[in-house]
Each structure stands twice: as structure tokens, then as C-alpha cells.
Amino acid sequence: MVEIKTLHCDIETYSSVNLAKCGVYPYVQADDFEILLFAYSTDGSEVKIIDLARGEKIPPVILSAIEDDKVIKYAHNASFERICFSSFLGYPVGKYISPESWRCTMTWAAYMGLPLSLVGVGAVLGLGKQKMMEGKDLIRFFCSLCSPTKANGNRTRNLPSDDPDKWERFKSYNIRDVETEMEIEQKLIKFPVPEFIWDEYHLSERINDRGIKVDMDFVKQAITKDEMSRTKLMGQMQKVTELDNPNSVQQMKGWLSENGVETDTLGKKAVAELLSLIHI
């Protein structure tokens, strides 16, 4: 068996948790998290794709390479792939695949003063295989919850069987991302990231993996107190102003105007200035 030295990879995933709002760690902890597609290349070979959503399996030798610190893994925003594969491989929360053998092409681009996005880097470097622009629509369609309608049979998620043509384009998109990442590496190979920068990157990853301890009882009580305070203050404001919704900027500005106070805004700074001038 030929020993794998490098692995370029990209995945497409599904989770009911909003990635942009919550980050990758809660994202992979969702019960419905799954890897849909996995495109990869070993040692610069032609990109292959595994359609996990349709039952295909990742070869054991590739799974071993993902965990093997002797195999250098490349991905754009590599922490996403690393954490997703940690969940996929059954690592417990708080324990993740070591970042030591991962190289992030986004970090490489940042070091070179290039755009951080894959499409931005591809455009600046004039790559032959640019990121496919329809990717956002495909990700929105397959990778997140959808609104139930009569037209879609009231489903809350789109599966490959719901639009086979789109699914095939999604697979092409996944493959193209790996091809683009590989071209980025070839373009930047003469400008390597110093080892001390990779050391800092790995340290940053370990810090993120470790997280911080949070007293959740305290957090929950603080949220409860905040809700109680808001309710109490809203009641007091309604009593004083006799407005239906004192939270409404327009209603509050109208009430202030009726009471001799004119203001164009109720931003924090403006309110502080008003309070210093008047007494209500």
C-alpha cells in the first residue's frame, strides 16, 4: 500500500443549527448533523468524491489519514473540516482531532495579504479553476432547513432525491472547491508560510478546541433576571407614557415631542445627552 503524504479535502454538511450564528462547535453537536459530501485528493491525484448522503462510505485508508499526524491535510478554513470529522468519527465533545497536521489555505492567503474567501483568492490569483458561483444557492438548498410549503410537500429539508440535477451540480461544486484549493497551493508554494506561523495557528486551534468553562446555572439565572427586568421596566414605561409600545422609536419620539423634547434619534449616545439636559 502506498503511504499517503498529503490530503486535500472539502466537505458539504447539514445541521439544523445555524453555523453563522453559533459557530462550528455547536453546529456539529446537533443531533441531525451529518456530512453529505466529501471531496478529496491524495498526493495531488485527481479529485474523488464520496456521496455519503446516498450511502457511499469513506475508504478506511482515508479515514486513517484524517487522524494520522504524519499526513498533512489541506482545506480552506480547515478548522471546519477538522471539527466536523471529529464529530463524524465519534470524538466526544471537548476532544477533537489534533490540529498539528492541518494546513489552512485561508490562513495561507491571509499571510500573503490575499482575500480570505476561496472565490476572492481564486480571482486575485487568476486560477484556471475558479470556485463555482452557484455554490451559495446549492448550500442554502441542501445544507439548511427549508420552509414547508404546499409546493415542496411541507418538507423542512431538501434531500438529494428532491432535486437530483441540483445534487449532481452540488457534487461538481464540492469537487471544484478541492481543485481550487490545490491550485492555490501550487500558486503559493514558492511563498511558504513560516513554521512559527503554523505553530501559532495550531495554538489558536487548540485554544478554540479547549474553550472556556461557563457556569450555566449563573447564565440561565442572568437571562431570567434580564427578562424580569425588561418586563418590569416596560410596565413602568407604559404607565408613564401611556404608549402601547414604548420600545417603538416612532412612538417614543412622538411622546417626547408632545412633552417638549425634540430629537432625531434615540441612540444610546443621544439618550445619554438628553438625560444630562432634562429630568423626566
What do the PLM-derived regions correspond to, one by one?
Residues G23-Y27, V61-I62, G267:
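Short secondary-structure capping/turn segments at boundaries of alpha-helices and beta-strands
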Residues L19-L36:
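A short alpha/beta connector and helix-capping loop motif
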